[in-house]
Amino acid sequence: EIDAKIDLSDEGYRFVTLLEREDGKKAFIRVYNDMWRLPSEAEISAALKRFAMKLPRVGFLSDHDARSIVGSRNRDHSYMVAAKTFRNSLINQGFDVVDVNLGRGREVLDSLDILVVSEPLEPFTTEEIEMLSRYIEEGKNLVLAGKPKTYTYLDPLMDLLGLRFEPGVLVQRQIEEYPSNLVLSRVTESAKDISRYWEILYGYTSRAFRPLSLVMPGAAAIAQESDKGFQLIPLLETRDSSGWNELETIDFLNDTVRLNSSIGEV
């Protein structure tokens, strides 16, 4: 009977609260699969913003087997970005998200405020690199997400920014039972002025008593190759000053990492 009044198939026929304006604009306030279940002020405000302003539109590139928002693999971003039952997903926090396929043409990029390219596993074509280059030249926001050993196909895009991924993986002196490639990092002083959120993170990770750490199980270093006119602001730095870029060790659980400066580990 509900289908005669409203189509809730996209909501999985779950309980929702519908907000609707006179002009037909609609927004849903949902319940979530967590301990609190009910929406908080943040989720309600995000829903109301759909009536008051144009929401930031975030595109996730799905070409070349990149991490997708429509897939269900462990490596995909579908849960954190588009899951309607996850409170902190982008769609529940005031963002519009869209799957981006460059085969549809340049126009798909024109509608975006942010483009995320996350770990593609195949090379881009020359035409696609040109499309992404124009996107960067227009001053739009681009997020490149790579990790050790799988960043190769991001290199052409990094080159447009004058950057490159360093070979190897960041490690630090082993702490208790944790593997050496589990990097404990803190927010840099230069990053705290980016936004109020980064300022709060800086305070948490830099305080003298029991500082918190941002943990990354496997991270690659980034180096500047050339000046392409961008201002560079490092966001995170390793907490341990004895950390280095490891080029030899593969088994971080059963092996012990050792700095070998003779092969370029620094």
What are the residue ranges of the model-derived segments?
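Hydrophobic targeting/anchoring helices
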Residues: 1-89
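Acidic, S/T/G-rich, low-cysteine, solvent-exposed domains in lumenal/extracellular/periplasmic regions
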Residues: 78-266
